[in-house]
Regions:
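Polar/charged low-complexity regulatory segments
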Residues: 1-191
C-alpha cells in the first residue's frame, strides 16, 4: 500500500517529491536548481494546458519580441521543454519527435536567455539533463511502469548523455535483451 504523504504546504510537498526523486535518480541538484524545479512544477500544475502548446513556434516567435516579453517567452519554452522531456516523454512520441528534440530546444531557450540577461539561466542550460533525470525518477517513484521504453532510453542516452536513461538501458538489457550488456557496461558516461 502506498503511504500517505502529509506536508504543510504544496511547496513543501513538491520539495519532498523532488528530494525523493533526486535520491532515486542518484542526482543531487544544488539548492538553486532544486528551488527552480519546485517553482516550475508548482507553476505548471496550476496551468497544465501550458505543456500542450507548440513550443517550437513559441521559440521562433520569441525572436520577434523584445525585452520582458521575450524573456518570459524564452523562460516558458525552456520550462515547458524541461517538463515534457522529464515528466511527459510520451508527448514527444505522440508528436513524432525524440525526447532529445525537447532537450535541445529547452537548453537553447535557457542559453539564449542567459546570453541576454545572464542570471542563472546558463546554469539551467548546463544542468538541463540532471534536472530531466530527476523528473524521470519522479515519474517512476510510485509506478515502475512509468519508465521510458528501452529504445527511447537508449536514444536519449545517446543524444544527451542522460545517466538516468543509461541506467534504464543497463537495467533493461541485463537479461540479454536487444543490447549487448558488455557494450553498455563499457559505455562512455562522460557526455
Amino acid at each position: 500500500m502506498t503511504s500517505l504523504v502529509l506536508e504543510p504546504t504544496s511547496t513543501a510537498l513538491w520539495q519532498a517529491l523532488v528530494s525523493d526523486a533526486e535520491a532515486a535518480a542518484n542526482r543531487q541538484l544544488d539548492e538553486t536548481l532544486e528551488s527552480y524545479l519546485v517553482l516550475t512544477l508548482m507553476r505548471f500544475t496550476q496551468r497544465p494546458e501550458l505543456v500542450s502548446s507548440v513550443m517550437a513556434l513559441e521559440f521562433l516567435d520569441s525572436a520577434q519580441k523584445a525585452g520582458q516579453q521575450q524573456h518570459a517567452q524564452l523562460r516558458d519554452v525552456g520550462d515547458k521543454c524541461l517538463l515534457v522531456s522529464g515528466l511527459f516523454p510520451q508527448n514527444a512520441k505522440r508528436r513524432l519527435v525524440s525526447i532529445g528534440y525537447f532537450v535541445n530546444m529547452g537548453r537553447s531557450a535557457y542559453q539564449q536567455l542567459h546570453d541576454k540577461i545572464h542570471g542563472f539561466y546558463g546554469q539551467l542550460a548546463a544542468d538541463f539533463i540532471p534536472m530531466m533525470d530527476v523528473l524521470h525518477a519522479m515519474r517512476e517513484l510510485n509506478d515502475q511502469s512509468q519508465h521510458i521504453d528501452l529504445l527511447d532510453a537508449f536514444e536519449l542516452w545517446e543524444e544527451t548523455g542522460s545517466q538516468h536513461a543509461l541506467e534504464r538501458v543497463k537495467d533493461g538489457s541485463s537479461g540479454g535483451h536487444m543490447i549487448k550488456r558488455d557494450w553498455i557496461d563499457g559505455a562512455d558516461t562522460s557526455h
